[in-house]
Design a protein with these regions (language model features):
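Phosphate-group recognition and catalysis centered on beta-loop-alpha active-site segments
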Residues: 2-5, 9-15, 19-22, 27-291
Length: 291
């Protein structure tokens, strides 16, 4: 879409301008966190998920300024570092998972009495999409998460402790093997529809994600077919009975009646995360409908 293309161009240009837009230091992140922790802070939106969040002008901060409670970052393992980008051509050594997400989140948690949003006691989800080399990338990610463990949700011998931030690992499926072998984890696994009803517990797979267009033909124009609506509601209710949340990607994301129609059906079915690149658009939609 044009929106995504424009953001990619901005990201690529920023990388090429040799520091014209500097990545915030921890101190700068702390200042930003303090600035946005005052009485004008937005009310958090439980269903708002920022797809490819790092393509926005201010990764993480733009989403949080709109009240989003889930953000997505794609990562590549390059020379022992986790770099955030959508494509290999966009890799920039200054745009790391730590600098764009972990450090700013920690700064906000410290500024807001242990939470990303002051007074909001649900975790904010950090969906980390490993693009390639899942095993090695996850092992490095696990190493990087540990210094931040006091703000992170964790699973110890199958028992979950919720923190201010819950990392969920998506993307390369091979990351599952080392994750399942761990007795102590600071991240969880993003399942697929085939994981519904499997032996994997919600303590390992708290989230079920799927490509909307692979399960549903309806894209918001005309009535929602009754069989597809029933399928959607059954999928969500099954996940919720298992203690799992649901997210669909590739839903319509061009502003207009079709997108609103799909989002309305997702809300009616109690889908947990609505996926968008349009932060302001989803915020307006949810604030008009969700109390």
């Amino acid at each position: 879409m044009v929106l995504i293309t424009r953001r990619r161009a901005v990201t690529t240009l920023a990388a090429a301008l040799a520091g014209a837009v500097a990545v915030p230091t921890y101190a700068q992140a702390a200042q930003a966190a303090q600035k946005h922790s005052g009485p004008t802070r937005p009310r958090p939106l439980r269903q708002a998920h920022a797809h490819n969040d790092y393509l926005h002008e201010r990764p993480l901060h733009d989403a949080l300024s709109h009240g989003f409670t889930s953000v997505e970052a794609d990562v590549f393992l390059v020379d022992g570092e986790l770099l955030v980008a959508h494509e290999p051509a966009e890799l920039d050594p200054t745009r790391t998972l730590r600098s764009l997400y972990l450090d700013p989140l920690l700064a906000r948690v410290k500024a807001n009495h242990g939470r990303v949003y002051r007074g909001y006691h649900r975790p904010v989800q950090l969906l980390i999409d490993i693009k390639t080399n899942g095993v090695a990338a996850y092992l490095e990610l696990d190493r990087q998460l540990r210094p931040y463990r006091r703000m992170l949700s964790s699973c110890t011998y199958g028992r979950v402790r919720l923190g201010a931030v819950t990392p969920v690992i998506s993307g390369d499926r091979s990351a599952r093997v080392p994750m399942e072998a761990q007795r102590v984890r600071y991240a969880f696994y993003d399942g697929r529809l085939e994981d519904l009803g499997s032996s994997a517990p919600a303590a390992f797979i708290p989230l079920i994600s799927s490509n909307w267009t692979q399960s549903f033909s309806w894209l918001g124009t005309g009535p929602f077919p009754a069989t597809e609506r029933e399928k959607l509601h059954t999928t969500v209710s099954t996940a919720h009975r298992n203690g799992q949340r649901v997210r669909f990607w590739a839903t319509p994301d061009v502003a207009g009646p079709a997108r609103d129609a799909v989002w309305s059906e997702l809300l009616a079915a109690r889908v947990d995360h609505l996926n968008t690149d349009d932060l302001a658009g989803l915020e307006r939609f949810l604030r008009a409908r969700v109390q």
